[in-house]
């Protein structure tokens, strides 16, 4: 992003002159208090909104609109109830063309990777909330996007399922080399997932914190001192700009 500004009519800028670069293959988390502009920034990164000034670039090209190089996952899985799991995963392909054998193979590989191979012919109503979120993740990755955008995707899940989904997301994106932008209110989630954490306040990115924890990440590290020092650092950054 280069000097990106976005304003809703009659309001101060929601995104106010942001310069931000994400390295390919990294996991970037975006945190900040409610109303600071996180979701608007995500929509700009997705091409769902166009900035009034500045540019959003993806792989060196100015982003004009959403395309197959982008994957999306939001808080509600929004699966099609009348379609089987495999067809829900293939939906981004079906919107562009008739799925071929390679598309189906890729979809089945994602379901297998996420522990859902035996559910390919089931309907969403037959799945738990966590399983539905895994289907939504597979759907977001089926076109092998360069950038995956997620807005509070696990917020409605219980703590155990949420932790499992965090591990699934990390493992799957690492294996595929996918660049991720993940919006969350949860500092501990951001520290667990992120290579970098951007702190947003009043439409600006006010801090960009590099997280250097040993990998692969496991849930037990949440109880260790280095993890909690990073959590305290992010919290201090958020508290400092809000004071």
Residues of each region from the PLM?
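A short, flexible loop at the N-terminus of ABC-type nucleotide-binding domains that lies
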Residues: 5-17
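The feature captures the beta-strand-to-loop junction immediately N-terminal to the Walker
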Residues: 31-33
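Helix-to-loop junction immediately C-terminal to a conserved catalytic motif
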Residues: 46
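Conserved ABC transporter NBD signature motif
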Residues: 54-66
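Short helical segment in ABC ATPase nucleotide-binding domains corresponding to the A-loop/adjacent helical element
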Residues: 86-94, 104, 210
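Conserved signature/switch motifs of ABC ATPase nucleotide-binding domains
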Residues: 122-125, 143
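Hydrophobic anchor residue at the start of the ABC signature
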Residues: 137
